Amino acid sequence: MPRTKSLAALIEQYGDDRCYKPNSRKIPMVYRILNRQIFKNQLKKMPKIMIRRMHGALGLFEFNPYALKHCHQITIHNKFKNFREFAEILGHEMVHYYQKLILKQNSARHNREFYSFKKKFNKLGLDLKRVYH
């Protein structure tokens, strides 16, 4: 099995000065890298991830307990400032997924458990915050 690239290598490859448009082939790769490096592979099942133009947000985590197939869904914007911003947003939504799936919290909020991942994000050169501009 081929080795996956590290997040640092991908950030360097795409750079911080060009726009990044995610696609459905790259997202699972970045998801696996973040899952391994931040969550120690605890997020076994990847939720459904949608890409669409959004107003007022760059990402969104949704939970629907009544859904038959996909009760967890991450929606991300279709265009980002750069690859780093995309990785931060995907990681941010993965923290909400972790809160719901692993910690079994009723609401995936920006609380103490959410910010407990800040050091892990910083180690990867990413920023974990409540609002991204």
Where is each model-derived feature located?
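Active-site-proximal or metal-binding-adjacent scaffold patches in catalytic folds
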Residues: 1-88, 97-133
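Walker B catalytic acidic pair
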Residues: 93
